[in-house]
């Protein structure tokens, strides 16, 4: 059932839970997420980020996500994640995304406001919800270093990358954005060390603004950290890294087990369709697990 982002997030706010937002990189990830949604009976958000364009073009992603969203028996939003420009967001709207994110977080504050205002005006005219970002959410690299999320604009980083509650209040007031991604210590990717989360900051921001708050970099946190963040005001949690990692691990284990058995017996080979099914099942189980965590009420 295809719905807009605002509908899902307003429901999550009322219930004091969070909705999972899962990046889609191929047919199998969409299949896994929607199967998990139906089996748990919970709404989900499927989203596409341009960082995954080497694997899946945005136009193909839109067709895949819209197909699965319409045939799934629970509410599903189709979201553009980390739109880097006005033009990218407009492309998402034309392709049928029910919500878009304009990520101008690496721009100066006033420029972030102006670009977000432009996207909100155009998107709302098409009944499309808009998420924006304030603060700096970093991406973890394999060597342990970090890079800032968002678009390719190069600006000086502020001393405090976390979202300021008063700045968030003014940002939402001026932009009329439907959801706000905030920075409080999470990062995209795999954590090499335990993240230092300022969960109290989430509560402070929640007191200042009424729109749903979004957590990026959800993979790798504990159940307690997720649930405290939700209790403090998070309504949408982006999750992809570990879902993808578990799928790869399941496929690797199956191949290794088959190769070991083949050395001693007449073991049937592993075909590509076997790998696909194994990956879908592994992702589905992980998505079901985090959906249940996000949906637990206080």
Put a short name on every predicted segment.
Residues 3-11, 26-51, 58-75, 83-208, ...:
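Alpha/beta enzyme core
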Residues 4-20, 266-272:
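Generic N-terminal amphipathic, Lys/Arg-enriched alpha-helix
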Residues 19, 102, 273-277:
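Active-site oxyanion-binding pockets that recognize sulfate/phosphate
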Residues 80, 249, 258:
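Glycine-rich nucleotide/cofactor/substrate-binding loop typically near the N-terminus or early
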Residues 185, 216-219:
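Glycine-rich beta-strand-to-loop/alpha-helix junction loops that act as flexible
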Residues 255-298:
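Extended, intrinsically disordered, low-complexity segments
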